[in-house]
Design a protein with these regions (language model features):
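N-terminal maturation segment of proteins
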Residues: 1-156
Length: 156
């Protein structure tokens, strides 16, 4: 509808993008590796992205809520092996675009939570394709509506 095209639900939009990106690592293949090594590498790529996104989201909170200075943030991020130049880039980004990283991380987390809930609820009847179809059929919307709608679609 025209009104929905004007409303933004960044958590859904960016969360779905992040969810899809992280899910895509399930299809990542490596030459000359056995199945177990491939699975471990897929998980490593996924975990690395989650860690990077989490650190960026925490940086946003520390700068915009806890009033971290550039020096504070550099010191904090250095504990994770992040160079001063990279910390400066993150600092400048979160100052100019507060809460942006949070829409990615919290949006992804909410979708991951919803998937886990549906998997637990449906057990062996859970179908990942049906879950993805249910999420996408809702379109960009607040998570309260998404959770209700996906639950209804998946349990029909």
């Amino acid at each position: 509808s025209p009104i929905r095209s004007m409303l933004r639900c960044d958590g859904y939009d960016e969360g779905w993008g992040t969810y899809a990106q992280l899910y895509s690592y399930n299809y990542l293949e490596f030459k000359n590796t056995d199945r177990e090594t491939t699975s471990l590498l897929q998980q490593l790529y996924r975990d690395n992205d989650i860690l990077s996104l989490s650190l960026s989201s925490l940086s946003d909170l520390y700068v915009n809520y806890e009033n971290y200075t550039l020096d504070n943030l550099c010191e904090y991020l250095s504990g994770y092996g992040i160079a001063e130049d990279n910390a400066r880039s993150i600092y400048e980004y979160v100052v100019e675009n507060p809460t942006t990283y949070l829409s990615y991380s919290i949006g992804w987390y909410k979708l991951e939570q919803l998937r886990n809930t549906m998997e637990e609820e449906l057990g062996s009847h859970f179908d990942i394709g049906e879950f993805h179809e249910a999420v996408l059929s809702c379109g960009s919307c607040p998570f309260s509506l998404l959770e209700e709608r996906v639950s209804t679609l998946m349990t029909e």
